[in-house]
Regions:
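Interfacial loop-to-helix junctions that mark the boundaries of transmembrane helices
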Residues: 16-22, 42-50, 61-62, 66, ...
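Lipid-exposed faces of alpha-helical membrane segments in multi-pass integral membrane proteins
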Residues: 29-36, 53-60, 75, 79, ...
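Structural signature of hydrophobic alpha-helical transmembrane segments
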Residues: 44-53, 97-108, 158, 299-309, ...
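Membrane-embedded alpha-helical segments and adjacent helix-loop junctions characteristic
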Residues: 15-19, 57, 70-71, 75-176, ...
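Juxtamembrane and boundary regions of transmembrane helices in multi-pass small-molecule transporters
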Residues: 2-35, 155-158, 174-183, 187-209, ...
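Flexible hinge motifs at transmembrane-helix junctions and intramembrane kinks/re-entrant loops
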Residues: 42-52, 56-74, 91, 239, ...
Length: 479
């Protein structure tokens, strides 16, 4: 996989040729469980019950990876229509929703940054100025990861870009594959690649959540408000991830004698700014400027992203061509559209009301104030993510429930939606994110390392969130 191809990947695990016993069991359950629900004597309207049967197929397929994620979603949407649960325009409504198109446009912008060389130049420039000691290089990797999130929305793409730099640095340090130096760099660039796109409205998961919040919460989700809501947490995460890695994996050596020379050499190889890089910088700069100021002009983030993405395809103005469009992996876009469609079907069949009542019944007595609401939603979402490995399916199936609960109980849908989405960033196992799977596949750290770092950062971010929600968010109008 190359950096050019990376943005097309999004956060979906690659399909495997040899199915695990777990996946085989999932394929069996995908048939038996929906049939059992379809013909069960549940006290529900037929349309609601049949919708749940197909929903069970989709969720089981996503949990067990019985088939490729997007294929499972396509089958589910088709069954909603073919079996008469809802009409075609509802079963496939997600494909006309702005959420999927936002992701498509974000992937185009990421492709602009990577194919033009802009992302790599930015990475080398930052690394050149942070210093040549291991602690400074590690901090530079984390800061670069965060800044790249603005121009390369795909966490997978950022991991691929930074991994190529980290491998060269590992060689420069003459560090072995299992050394603390190599382990620390790859572990933290992988994990932060997974969480930064929850703090910025950039990755597929955050985009899916924002679309569901708009649809089911009836609210306007602004890119700038999202950025500033999590900006303090972003800063804390950068520093906490840096110090945590140095503490858990102290380097065998501190300095890199030719660190500055290495980055200067790489920048020299790239030469002066090319026309493509200049165009890419202008296009991405326009997108970021419009996103950050959307609280003023109220141009939807999707409109900005799609406008810039299409401009990048225009002759003479853009930097992408027909071949770039052909290389783009559209499966993540389809997957998001299918997750949105599923939520719309739940609403149309009244299944959303049933699920909200069941899911929130046992936690409702404890949701008494802003502190308990924040804590319970955070940890419930964290645990729920163990069941639905994909962030898109996790957020696509749960955000509608959170929005419905917020509206029926007089709570702020934006506040609850941001808390729930942010909690999706906390992970312990590679299977929970395609980004983690790709980082883990390089072989520089082990599964237990991911658990250690993930557990610490999940707790740290929870503490920060408990301070932001009641004290900082009201300053932004999020009460």
């Amino acid at each position: 996989m190359t950096a050019t191809e990376a943005p097309a990947g999004a956060s979906l695990p690659q399909p495997r040729e040899n199915l695990s016993p777990f996946a085989v069991a999932g394929q069996i359950l995908c048939v038996l469980v929906p049939i059992a629900i379809w013909f069960s004597p549940l006290d529900l309207a037929p349309q609601t019950k049949h919708g749940f049967a197909i929903l069970a197929f989709m969720v089981i397929a996503w949990i067990t990876e019985a088939t490729e994620f997007a294929l499972s979603g396509f089958i589910g949407c088709f069954l909603f229509w073919a079996l008469g649960v809802v009409k075609f325009d509802v079963a496939f409504s997600g494909f006309s929703d702005s959420t999927a198109w936002f992701l498509f446009a974000a992937m185009l912008i990421g492709l602009v940054a990577s194919t033009s060389g802009l992302a790599r130049r930015l990475a080398y420039t930052i690394m050149l100025h942070v210093g040549a000691t291991y602690p400074r290089i590690l901090l530079g990797l984390i800061v670069t990861d965060f800044l790249l999130t603005f121009i390369v929305p795909s966490g997978l793409a950022r991991v691929v870009i930074l991994a190529s730099i980290a491998m060269a640095l590992t060689e420069a340090f003459r560090a072995a594959r299992g050394s603390n130096i190599a382990r620390g760099m790859f572990l933290i660039l992988t994990y932060t690649g997974n969480i930064f796109d929850k703090m910025i409205l950039a990755g597929a998961g955050a985009i899916t959540a924002a679309g569901a919040m708009t649809k089911f919460g009836g609210i306007e989700v602004l890119w700038g408000v999202w950025l500033f809501a999590f900006l303090p947490c972003s800063i804390v995460t950068v520093l906490a991830a840096w110090r945590l890695t140095l503490w858990l994996y102290p380097p065998e050596q501190d300095g890199l004698s030719r660190g500055h020379e290495y980055f200067q050499t790489e920048l020299k190889k790239m030469g002066p700014w090319s026309v493509a890089e200049t165009k890419a910088a202008l296009l991405v700069g326009c997108a970021i400027a419009l996103w950050v100021t959307d609280f003023w002009h109220h141009i939807p983030p999707t409109m900005v992203a799609l406008g810039i993405g299409l401009a990048a395809l225009l002759p003479r103005i853009g930097v992408l061509g027909p071949d770039d469009m052909r290389r783009l992996n559209y499966m993540p876009v389809f997957f998001v559209a299918e997750a949105v469609s599923m939520g719309n079907v739940l609403e149309a069949t009244k299944g959303l009301n049933v699920l909200t009542t069941v899911v929130f019944h046992w936690i409702e007595p404890y949701l008494t104030n802003i502190f308990s609401i924040t804590a319970i939603l955070y940890w419930v979402a964290f645990v729920y993510h163990f069941l639905l490995a994909s962030e898109i399916s996790m957020l696509g199936t749960s955000i509608p429930l959170v929005m419905d609960y917020a509206k029926t109980h007089g709570l702020n849908p934006l506040q609850l939606g941001l808390i729930w989405t942010f909690a999706a960033g906390g992970k312990l196992f590679a299977y929970q994110s395609g980004v983690l799977i790709v980082g883990y596949s390089y072989g520089y750290f082990e599964a237990r390392d991911l658990v250690r770092v993930g557990a610490w950062l999940t707790v740290i971010e929870f503490v920060v969130l408990m301070l932001l929600v009641p004290f900082y968010w009201p300053l932004l109008g999020i009460h």
